[in-house]
Curated annotation (Swiss-Prot):
Compartments where located: Plastid, Chloroplast
Function: One of the primary rRNA binding proteins, it binds directly to 16S rRNA where it nucleates assembly of the head domain of the 30S subunit.
InterPro entries documented for this protein: Ribosomal_uS7, Ribosomal_uS7_bac/org-type, Ribosomal_uS7_CS, Ribosomal_uS7_dom, Ribosomal_uS7_dom_sf
Annotated keywords: Chloroplast, Plastid, Ribonucleoprotein, Ribosomal protein, RNA-binding, rRNA-binding
Quaternary structure note: Part of the 30S ribosomal subunit.
HAMAP family xrefs: Ribosomal_uS7_B
Gene this protein is translated from: rps7-A
GO molecular function: rRNA binding; structural constituent of ribosome
Keyword presence, Ribosomal protein: yes
Highest taxon of the lineage: Eukaryota
PANTHER family according to UniProt: RIBOSOMAL PROTEIN S7
Protein name: Small ribosomal subunit protein uS7cz/uS7cy
Family per similarity comment: Belongs to the universal ribosomal protein uS7 family.
Length: 155
């Protein structure tokens, strides 16, 4: 048995402009090649674009979009008897938010159009209304989990 104590769970820092942890999680997912200032610029431009499109608080739109995209259940591949099975597992709120952020970014990168700020803002607005690529991904995951419900005991 290990003599070391259990590691303290780290809390995400909040960003300087909005003072919001969710925004900071988003910035850390946008980040590419360590260019954090570029990620900040991209997100702030996106939120300004959201404000222009909806004339509402962009943070509330962001929260609503992430809430709607966050999955309750996911599937995980497990090997049993030479075959791989997709086993449905429940996921926690933090992991669910991380998945939602990842799906939102992936869906906005796939969108046609100009710059990333515009594509990401469009995806956020669509997700807050309950449509778009990220919502489709969530529904697809839920369908997959429902189809493989018989393997739920494999966990």
């Amino acid at each position: 048995m290990s003599r070391r104590g259990t590691a303290e769970e780290k809390t995400a820092k909040s960003d300087p402009f909005y003072r919001n942890r969710l925004v900071n999680m988003l910035i850390n997912r946008i980040l590419k090649h360590g260019k954090k200032s570029l990620a900040y610029q991209l997100l702030y431009r996106t939120l300004k674009e959201v404000q222009k499109k909806t004339e509402r608080n962009p943070l509330s739109i962001l929260r609503e979009a992430i809430r709607r995209v966050t999955p309750d259940i996911a599937v995980k591949a497990r090997r049993k008897g030479g075959s791989t099975r997709q086993v449905p597992i429940e996921i926690g709120s933090t992991q669910g938010k991380a998945l939602a952020i990842r799906w939102l970014l992936a869906a906005s990168r796939k969108r046609p159009g100009g710059n990333m700020a515009f594509k990401f803002s469009s995806e956020l607005v669509d997700a807050s209304k309950g449509k778009g690529g990220a919502i489709r991904k969530k529904e697809e995951t839920h369908k997959m989990a429902e189809a493989n419900r018989t393997f739920a005991h494999f966990r």
